[in-house]
């Protein structure tokens, strides 16, 4: 059951995060929105509440451990509990390695890898103590299939695949009942392409998304499905994308 579950969503100011927050709130979840663009969060939370839902928003830079700890604390202070976190914040400034976009490389590592580590570090004490909790994370089909221009981005998503699987395995071994699900979206129409600074790569990716891209609400429905499963059941991976996208 989703009703009354308290769910933190990172990267909640647009795209998949925003769509998920709105859908879960309609299902009766208490959603906690985190992102850097506080003005966007404020608007989304207000609209959720005007529609009869419950929402809290907190400024969140996932690269900062203190921010991650703070959003967990605020969620528990406001709603008295925490049931799940959806680690959705991410960047995709793809480029060929020869372009030497080293600032982009480091930014992807900071957000896509360290941001996940920080989020898990923030919730793990709570989930371990209560012997329940759900960690969901947005990866990418780039974490399943290599492609030119996606070396660093894909590498961060391959990391996520291994990390989330080991989190699941260790929880099962230790009896903490922490479930872990990784979602691998293909072409989803979000602001992700706006993070690409290499013009040629951006043009190629935009052509792909213009042809195949589907709504972020499709991924929100996957999160909804996962959270609606009985507590003793887990689907640990979802690969989701346009039905007509070849890869």
What are these regions (language model features)?
Residues 13-14:
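Conserved glycine-rich cofactor-binding loop
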Residues 27-44:
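Conserved glycine-rich Rossmann-like NAD(P)H-binding loop of the short-chain dehydrogenase/reductase
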Residues 120, 156:
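Active-site helix of classical SDR
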Residues 96-97, 104-107:
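Substrate-binding pocket helix/loop in short-chain dehydrogenase/reductase
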Residues 140:
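Residue(s) in the substrate-gating loop at a strand-loop-helix junction
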Residues 38-39, 59-70, 102:
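The beta1-alpha1 cofactor-binding region of Rossmann-like NAD(H)/NADP(H)-dependent oxidoreductases
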Residues 178, 182-183, 202-247:
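C-terminal helical subdomain
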